[in-house]
């Protein structure tokens, strides 16, 4: 959003089953209202999954992009990397990636080799990209592009802020805990939510009971997912007997302000 004054964006907008699949969504007006950029150009092409070769070829023909930018695990884009030679004749491939831990994933080498620009969201990622490519770095560009949040939207608040206090009272039904852990993501296996819940249980066990009873773990995610696990069962197994109020599920869609609270 906040690069709309530098770039025109066309996004293949994926979802498991996108309700707007097949449409072309023009976001220019909403981006202008959000950023004040009066000539913003942001377009979405909703698809199921992560797209495919046919839609990319059509976008290249219709939109004539100057570059292609990828985000997330490269294995979701094997279809695109299989088109590498076709694409890179005229359009560079750029990849905003993260790999946080060693050993360096040598099995990613073919993906990295298919990119003209590798942007790491941590300095360690940049180093790992270079280690994997080794002597095959060629003339690729490596950049450190750190993750960030819009500080106008996500910021510290005065504990006495009226709306903040009202939200907490409503959210916790007037029984506001002293310590809160907040999880906000999808219920999928790689997020390892049950492991985090077990760690929270260990944390509670390390506290006096009266202190532990004033702590809460808020899970803003699906309770049950085919792509993850049954978190209600995990809660029942780890918490219900000793800490029945320690886990709170949140399913309602939250506004940006509410997420900041």
Q: What do these predicted regions represent?
A:
Residues 1-21, 29, 63:
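N-terminal subdomain of nucleotide-sugar transferases
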Residues 15, 124, 148:
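Carbohydrate-associated surface elements
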Residues 22-117, 123:
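Extended catalytic core of nucleotide-activated donor transferases of GT-like folds
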Residues 43, 85-86, 214, 219-223, ...:
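Nucleotide-activated donor-binding/catalytic signature segment of Leloir-type glycosyltransferases, i.e.
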Residues 96, 121, 183-185, 220-222, ...:
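Short hydrophobic "strand-cap" motifs at the C-terminus of beta-strands
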Residues 155-174:
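A short helix/loop element that forms part of the nucleotide-sugar donor recognition site in Leloir-type
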Residues 173-191, 197-200, 217-218:
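Conserved donor-binding/catalytic core segment of Leloir-type glycosyltransferases
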Residues 188-192, 204, 225-226:
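A short, basic/aromatic alpha-helical/loop segment that forms part
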């Amino acid at each position: 959003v906040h690069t709309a004054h530098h770039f025109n964006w066309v996004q293949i907008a994926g979802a498991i089953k996108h309700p707007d699949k097949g449409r072309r969504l023009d976001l220019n007006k909403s981006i202008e209202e959000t950023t004040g950029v009066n000539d913003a150009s942001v377009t979405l092409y909703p698809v199921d999954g992560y797209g495919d070769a046919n839609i990319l070829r059509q976008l290249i023909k219709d939109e004539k992009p100057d570059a292609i930018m990828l985000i997330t695990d490269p294995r979701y884009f094997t279809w695109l990397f299989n088109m590498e030679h076709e694409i890179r004749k005229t359009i560079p491939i750029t990849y905003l990636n993260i790999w946080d831990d060693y050993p360096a994933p040598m099995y990613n080498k073919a993906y990295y080799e298919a990119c003209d620009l590798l942007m790491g969201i941590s300095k360690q990622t940049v180093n790992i990209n270079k280690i994997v490519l080794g002597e095959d770095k060629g003339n690729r560009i490596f950049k450190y592009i750190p993750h960030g949040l819009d500080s106008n939207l996500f910021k510290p608040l005065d504990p006495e802020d009226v709306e903040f206090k009202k939200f907490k009272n409503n959210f916790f039904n007037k029984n506001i805990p002293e310590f809160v852990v907040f999880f906000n993501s999808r219920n999928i296996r790689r997020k390892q939510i049950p492991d985090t819940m077990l760690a929270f249980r260990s944390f509670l066990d390390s506290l006096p009971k009266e202190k532990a009873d004033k702590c809460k773990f808020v899970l803003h995610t699906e309770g049950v997912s085919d792509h993850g696990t049954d978190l209600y069962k995990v809660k029942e197994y780890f918490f219900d007997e000793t800490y029945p109020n320690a886990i709170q599920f949140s399913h309602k869609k939250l506004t940006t302000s509410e997420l900041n609270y």
